[in-house]
Amino acid sequence: AAGYKNITVLDISAEALEKAKKRLGPKAAQVHWIVCDITTFETDTLYDVWHDRAAFHFLTAPAQIQNYIATAKKAVSGFLAIGTFSKKGPFKCSGLEIIQYNETELKTLMEDGFNALNCTTENHTTPFNTQQNFLFCSFKRL
């Protein structure tokens, strides 16, 4: 919440949100917290920036992916940033199935509503000191 206003944080896990609130301390009161599955999230709010740090790769059913994209197209007025496992990343995460993406696949999924700006891959070191390769892509709403 460093200088930004009107921040919303959404996660399927109430426990994860509680941990984030504790890390922010008193600044947590400045954030709108939502416990929800992103594939069922409905809002009339427009967001200047939507940052998905690692949810998209957990959407494994075509309907989930399409619901996510439809929600983003409705809710994003500015920029969308997605971090997802690359083709060099793990096949599962936290025991759950995931989908790996390459730059072309992610851009193709988003092309109906977003212009791709930049994509990059990077290794992320987990708390267990293992490496996971991520693909990060940024988009601008058409």
Predicted region positions:
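Class I (Rossmann-like) S-adenosyl-L-methionine-dependent methyltransferase catalytic domain
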Residues: 1-45, 59-142
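A conserved beta-strand element that flanks and buttresses the S-adenosyl-L-methionine
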Residues: 51
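Short catalytic micro-motifs in class I SAM-dependent methyltransferases
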Residues: 54-58
